[in-house]
Amino acid sequence: MLAQVNASAAVVLRNQHHAILITIAVTTLAAALGLVFALLVSGGITRPVRLLLEGTRQVEAGYLDQPIDVITGDEIGQLTAAFNRMVEQLRHKERIRETFGRYVDPRVVEALIDQPKLAAVEGQRRVMTVMFCDMKGFTNLSAGMTPQGLVKVMNLYLSTMSEPIRRHRGVIDKYIGDAIMAYWGPPFVEEADEAQFACVAAIEIIERLAKLRGELTELLGLRVMPAEVDLRIGIATGEALVGSIGSDIMMNYTVMGDTVNLAARLEAANKLYGSRALTADATVAKTDGTIQFREVDRLRVVGQTQSQAIFELMGRKGELTPAQSLLCARYAEGLTAYRERRWEQARGAFAAALEAVPGDGPATTLVKRIDYLQQSPPGPDWDGAWRLEAK
């Protein structure tokens, strides 16, 4: 009897142990399956979130070309799709900005976007420096060209001459045929620097002329570039109206006023003096002393009642040749005598200037003017100024 009881107890213990093992195995399996399921579920949630976070970082860094894959249909998937649509809109706006940056100076585009108050139609009065640059002899050069050839020549010329303006922080306002209008001033350049930047840009434009003539000769298939192909530059500094100017349907952020007109008149005055780059005393006064100028005359331009001293940009100070330095000295002597009506002394000084640099335009012009004034003497109130009749 006792043996049977012991045997039954042993069976019960074995069954109990077996049941415990089965329970442990089932529990372990369930836990493992639960863990795997939890990992799968959490991965399905966190992976889209990680992708979205990485996409946000890419956009913040300026990379807008890679959309995020939408891998779920839940709220995170909807958020990802909305994010992709936002990035596409940003890409579209960036394309617009890049496109218009080729038609309007990129800094103007950026300023109008970032500072909406600049688009106000009232405008502001600021001291600005304005440049006009024109190609002399372009009309004759372009005669007989095909439209395609003319476009190539224009693009080469405008690209070559625009680069120094941009590099020295000028804003190209517009192209007017073969002429360039540019300006320097707030908010793009500090007022204290604008005249210096404009004059340095003008010097570099003149330095590029020889290279441009060579490239045009090759482009047009000419043996020699016509001598009349040259540059005329006018620079003026003074108060101007700055702002968005135009109609209800089209606006232009530009500068207007007497300073702009003076720059245009000085560019045209190069025809009278046979010079390349003329500026006025207000511009000279705001440069830093590293540029060599030569006072050419006193001029009263169309639209202004007061005369002002005009100067030719000769180059960087210290880089003039001995002949150019002698030219400046003799010309200054002649100009002093000319204003004091000492005609023969003035003629002699200008002749000495022409010996230093034969064919110098301003000296040639003043010698001819002395001939005229000796035949038609000026009145007693003459201040030495010449009136520029033509625009």
Residue ranges, per PLM feature:
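Juxtamembrane amphipathic/coiled-coil helical coupling segments that flank
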Residues: 1-23
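Cytosolic-side ends of inner-membrane transmembrane helices, especially those
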Residues: 26-46, 60
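Catalytic NTP-binding/metal-coordinating core of nucleotidyl cyclase/transferase enzymes
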Residues: 119-201, 253
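Membrane-proximal alpha-helical signal-transduction linkers
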Residues: 44-66, 71, 80-82, 87
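Alpha-helical scaffold within the catalytic cores of cyclic-nucleotide enzymes
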Residues: 154-170, 186, 190-233, 258-271, ...
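Membrane-proximal coiled-coil signaling linkers
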Residues: 91-125
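Cytosolic regulatory/linker segments at or just downstream of nucleotide-handling modules
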Residues: 240, 269-345, 351-353, 357-379
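HAMP exit helix and analogous amphipathic coiled-coil linker helices
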Residues: 2, 76, 85-101
